[in-house]
């Protein structure tokens, strides 16, 4: 095939300019011209320009019909590309090869088999258009998988017809084509676009489509489509995806400011609807992505026992979060299939939402259990309306322009959300200690055990105050004895000594219950490894989780993350929280006792005779009642937690 220099657009080809790369060449087998192949793949926009330029040149040099073949794998963007050309050149005609499918030839549900195409009718239509005659193009119904009629197509005024389909560059059609164009894209986005297209066009269930992709689409692509695409003169690598177009995005304003339900209701129309939801969002990391920088998570949401797969990407236009989202219901079995394809679980977030919706905008509060934070969100399709509602709520100046998964990435909380808390992993043990009295030994041992527990799993800001307070509790009885030895004996101090002794006995009893408490946690903690089967790989580790409808969810993931969702771990977390609350009560009780004893001693030293009656009345009424109530509350709380 020789280059005809007499028709070349430029005697000096300048490869730096795209318009100069689109060159004509004359065919050896006919007097028609075609495009010199462009070696490097072009982007979506550059490919669009190159195709428009090529069509204009071909229309200038060739007589009759200009037939353009546009091929590519399912969901790669062929239809979007042809529609873009049609908007720019309304006088062209488009023939979609999907309309030439013959439903009677379908074998095992494989709609991408090349034998499914009715080439006889297609070739008759092409030859009819070349002869300048109107033709009857079939109409194919994807829901019924059958041909339901015909439409009349006449030769367009521009004489340009685009033949679009996965086999538009097949060997049977190539001799008739004046221009060959291929469109391909990434596997991840091809999957998304295929699901999106088929849901809208065929009404198929998403699970069926994904199974269809894995079983038929890619094998057919490798065997029949990919070899034809190599013959294209213009190759387009489509990085365009359903999200980057933002045809129907959701605008979100998020704030950490506290807003009451009454304020939310006042900002909405009168016909708003109110509801509450509890959701579990499982964020799936695509293969090869960095968990700290990924912006294209797949999110599987569990709500009311139903699972939805959500494709979304986020763009921040401060203070807005723009989220083009695609959601469809799937079976829980899909999670295992995606993980088998290389997806991994990045994190699982539990969210409780209080939602107010008036069809124009959604206002809701989200409480995230793992982050222990509450946020208010205003969401809607109208950017201006969302901003107005947020202003009515007084959110200006308090916006958080980050999604929840971005906040985890930015605050480096991934490990905190994925792994079990360190304090639940710490083994609770009791060290022997030699002290002067059995009561002090029991109390000191319990305190030492708890101090080791706290140092192993709680921050220094929490443990340091306890280090100063708890020893005062353990030495309370000893200090009282030393104080009484220096003070003169009186009728008031004798009942006081008996009261302190009784109080010490009660505290010792409480410490014994605390020991039982810590033993219970240790027992529960020891059960954790028994619930998890050891495995050398994350992907082979399975944990059964029951959802609301009784079905069993089994999927591969990090052991520490999945155990967190188990009933055993919920019990351990509740027990640990109860223990911390009891320890705070013990701190408060210790401080009260120290203040009371110090005040009593000071008063006795100043005026022993004058304060005897007052101290006796105080001890006989107010103090025993207050301290008795405090100890009783702590004891009841501890006993209920043990139960």
Swiss-Prot record:
<dbReference type="GO" id="GO:1900055">
    <property type="term" value="P:regulation of leaf senescence"/>
</dbReference>
<comment type="function">
    <text>Exhibits pyrophosphatase activity with stronger affinity for pyrophosphate (PPi), moderate affinity for ATP and ADP, and weak affinity for tripolyphosphate (PPPi). No activity observed toward uridine substrate. Positively regulates natural and dark-induced leaf senescence.</text>
</comment>
<dbReference type="GO" id="GO:0016301">
    <property type="term" value="F:kinase activity"/>
</dbReference>
<dbReference type="InterPro" id="IPR027417">
    <property type="entry name" value="P-loop_NTPase"/>
</dbReference>
<feature type="transit peptide" description="Mitochondrion">
    <location>
        <begin position="1"/>
        <end position="15"/>
    </location>
</feature>
<dbReference type="InterPro" id="IPR023577">
    <property type="entry name" value="CYTH_domain"/>
</dbReference>
<feature type="transmembrane region" description="Helical">
    <location>
        <begin position="618"/>
        <end position="638"/>
    </location>
</feature>
<dbReference type="Pfam" id="PF00485">
    <property type="entry name" value="PRK"/>
</dbReference>
<keyword id="KW-0472">Membrane</keyword>
<dbReference type="GO" id="GO:0016462">
    <property type="term" value="F:pyrophosphatase activity"/>
</dbReference>
<keyword id="KW-0378">Hydrolase</keyword>
<keyword id="KW-1000">Mitochondrion outer membrane</keyword>
<feature type="domain" description="CYTH">
    <location>
        <begin position="248"/>
        <end position="410"/>
    </location>
</feature>
<dbReference type="InterPro" id="IPR006083">
    <property type="entry name" value="PRK/URK"/>
</dbReference>
<dbReference type="GO" id="GO:0004427">
    <property type="term" value="F:inorganic diphosphate phosphatase activity"/>
</dbReference>
<keyword id="KW-0611">Plant defense</keyword>
<keyword id="KW-1133">Transmembrane helix</keyword>
<protein>
    <recommendedName>
        <fullName>Inorganic pyrophosphatase TTM1</fullName>
        <ecNumber>3.6.1.1</ecNumber>
    </recommendedName>
</protein>
<dbReference type="GO" id="GO:0006952">
    <property type="term" value="P:defense response"/>
</dbReference>
<keyword id="KW-0809">Transit peptide</keyword>
<dbReference type="InterPro" id="IPR033469">
    <property type="entry name" value="CYTH-like_dom_sf"/>
</dbReference>
<dbReference type="Pfam" id="PF01928">
    <property type="entry name" value="CYTH"/>
</dbReference>
<keyword id="KW-0496">Mitochondrion</keyword>
<keyword id="KW-0812">Transmembrane</keyword>
<dbReference type="GO" id="GO:0005524">
    <property type="term" value="F:ATP binding"/>
</dbReference>
<dbReference type="GO" id="GO:0005741">
    <property type="term" value="C:mitochondrial outer membrane"/>
</dbReference>
